[in-house]
């Protein structure tokens, strides 16, 4: 079993996490990095605290106390508009300070967002490099997450 924490964007602080939890169950999106059949348990779910992400300094510690072995930065940070400009900083800080792996992405990118974002100059390759698991999903899976 792998225990994970999820940090979402502060803009979506009222999000119920339905797509993220579905992706955990289905091993899709960012959770496809874990072996099929391996149980994934969410031991923490919080938001970044809003720009500039003050909770990122403290929230991982609580998740680790609950047994988190990895932290996921939610897909909303990748596909929100504008995408979070601090994703790389959050990932680097958490990995270096807390010595825990960070996966960028939770649920697959919904096709309706991908269709818009893929043509924007600020997105494309830079997001594929930081969140590769999100870009490996089929168009059918992405459409299922609309």
What residue spans do the PLM features occupy?
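Conserved mixed alpha/beta catalytic, RNA-binding, or beta-rich assembly cores of soluble enzyme
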Residues: 1-63, 83-86, 100, 108, ...
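Mid-chain, well-packed structural core segment of small domains
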Residues: 57-92
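Short beta-alpha junction loops
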Residues: 75-79, 106-111
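Alpha-helix-loop-beta-strand connector modules within alpha/beta enzyme cores
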Residues: 94-101
């Amino acid at each position: 079993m792998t225990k994970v924490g999820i940090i979402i964007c502060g803009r979506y602080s009222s999000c119920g996490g339905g797509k993220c939890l579905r992706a955990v169950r289905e091993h899709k999106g960012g959770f496809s990095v874990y072996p099929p059949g391996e149980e994934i348990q969410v031991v923490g779910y919080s938001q970044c605290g809003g720009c500039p992400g003050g909770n990122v300094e403290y929230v991982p510690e609580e998740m680790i106390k609950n047994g988190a072995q990895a932290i996921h930065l939610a897909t909303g940070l990748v596909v929100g508009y504008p995408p979070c400009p601090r994703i790389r900083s959050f990932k680097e800080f958490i990995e270096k300070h807390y010595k825990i792996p960070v996966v960028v992405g939770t649920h697959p990118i919904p096709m309706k967002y991908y269709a818009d974002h893929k043509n924007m100059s600020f997105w494309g390759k830079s997001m594929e490099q930081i969140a590769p698991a999100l870009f490996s999903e089929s168009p059918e899976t992405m459409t299922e997450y609309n």
